[in-house]
């Protein structure tokens, strides 16, 4: 249960940090129901969050991560989207954790992308053909790897994430 909470917190922090990268703030302190959060922007798309329970650092991606780093294949010809990609590393009382998220776009249609990933990863955990979305997830080597595809007006958005966190006792 704690591991799931850490994974969800990491994903939430990553989403929030992506939104804050361009804000230009250098250092801010926030009061939340859970306590004080210190936010520091260190430049170059790097933001650090510190609380009484640990810290997390987000860094916006500038290079395409490898399939090995992601733990999943990258759809051929898909274009890397730096703005939707980055990494989080941090520590808490439970130990160290890290998350890497890479976003890609392709002009290919949903069915073609879905078929390709199905051939590489097997049946998705979730698929909604009408909404044009599918998700795969696996736990491997101490990390959770997820692939999500979402049909867009033109083409498909692909999000691959790899998260490592301490195992719950």
Model-derived features with residue positions:
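Bacterial N-terminal signal peptides that target proteins for export
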Residues: 1-13
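Low-complexity, intrinsically disordered/propeptide-like segments
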Residues: 10-12, 16-17, 33, 124
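C-terminal motif of bacterial Sec signal peptides marking the signal peptidase cleavage site
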Residues: 18-22
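An acidic-aromatic pocket/loop used at catalytic or ligand-binding sites
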Residues: 23-169
């Amino acid at each position: 249960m704690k591991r799931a909470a850490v994974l969800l917190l990491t994903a939430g922090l990553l989403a929030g940090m992506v939104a804050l990268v361009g804000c230009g703030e250098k250092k801010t302190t926030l009061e939340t129901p859970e306590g004080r959060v210190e936010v520091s922007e260190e430049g170059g798309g790097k933001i650090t969050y510190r609380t009484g329970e640990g810290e997390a650092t987000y860094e916006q991606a500038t290079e395409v991560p490898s399939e090995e780093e992601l733990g999943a294949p990258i759809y051929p010809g898909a274009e890397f989207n730096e703005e939707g990609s980055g990494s989080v590393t941090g520590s808490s009382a439970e130990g160290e954790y890290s998350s890497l998220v890479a976003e890609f776009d392709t002009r290919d249609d949903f069915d073609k992308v879905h078929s390709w990933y199905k051939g590489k990863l097997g049946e998705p955990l979730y698929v909604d053909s009408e909404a044009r979305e599918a998700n795969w997830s696996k736990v491997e080597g101490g990390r959770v790897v997820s692939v999500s595809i979402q049909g867009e007006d033109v083409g498909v958005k692909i999000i691959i994430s790899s998260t490592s966190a301490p195992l719950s006792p």
